């Protein structure tokens, strides 16, 4: 969809539809009051009649409003004016897009970006409107033989800002919002792919494809033979039961001549059966989403390719498949990781940390400024935080604060969990340096504690996205998270300013 920004009076807009807000109880927004004046009280008469209360998400579509050049006016309920926050703002944008898409309005001018949202500026409102609109219109229907097609879908949406000074800010917000939502789309498309198609080799092909389309990105793919030469035995153990070869794709974005790189490491288990410690059948189909970390890294690199910030970033897609087989690794095995540390396997379904620990050792060679790993790592994180926030752990307070700040700015929430030394005691082994699972108590934290043993040489953070990477049930599918958080973090690091 095409987006634009302008600053003008609502009654003078020649458009298929203009969108304005109404507050609860039956109170016109400032822009709606302008329309009411030029229409001799037409809107206020409708409200007095009880046609719209103004509750969040209510919609009323009007045709041929007197004194207004637009063909239609869409009144949108925004709840109580003083309570309009970022969550409600996204809800009303989502409902607005859905309604416009069904009205036959192929283009519209939206004045909702002039509403006051607590603690948010014009840049935030326009960018979030773009991201929300794009995500609302997302479909994954590649494998459907009969695709649903709207007769006259929404093609163009223009956001109005209060002053002409905000036009350049709005244009930058649209550019950022489009890049992030395009990155989210790539993330969602790859994650939603069925596991018979999205294998480690498929992940590698997508990494190469992005490099082919962007002069700032190069991709190198490392297969099992080279992994063996590097001593990545923990990573390889996970892949032993699968006929699909493990592949690690290393993508380098070069936007600065000599800055130290920030490294993003994405867990890429394209299917996780649990291995010998096999998972229950119910819900196992969703284990195709166990590569959500790698998908989010690919999506973030896609956003970087569009935004071209002056920063160096390395994205690693750690692709593998965890399957049961006569060659599969077993509970009781002891593995020697690339770092030389030994790991006693208690559960083959705690495999993501075995893949990641070797990749975290591998990336030492880049002498990174900081490393962030992203993984659908533990069900325990879902129990702790649900689907609203990703779990964050770090060995470096400033890095953790940067990521939390990026989560607030982007609306892609994260919550920090502790990594106290006491948790390390849960992963001690009588036979090796550590075990690969610390049991049920604090399971998300002990997984982070395990990874922390491989990150002594750099500043590191871990994002557990098991609760945020995908949805189940009627809305089943990838969410595209945490692409907004990661992209915002990198934009902040690159010093990208919002105002010109």
Curated annotation (Swiss-Prot):
Its main location: cytoplasm. Binds 2 manganese ions per subunit. Its cofactor is Mn(2+). Its EC number is 3.4.11.1, 3.4.11.10. It is an enzyme of class 3 (hydrolase). One of its GO terms (cellular component) is cytoplasm. The keyword Hydrolase applies. The keyword Ion transport does not apply. This is Probable cytosol aminopeptidase. It comes from Tolumonas auensis (strain DSM 9187 / NBRC 110442 / TA 4).
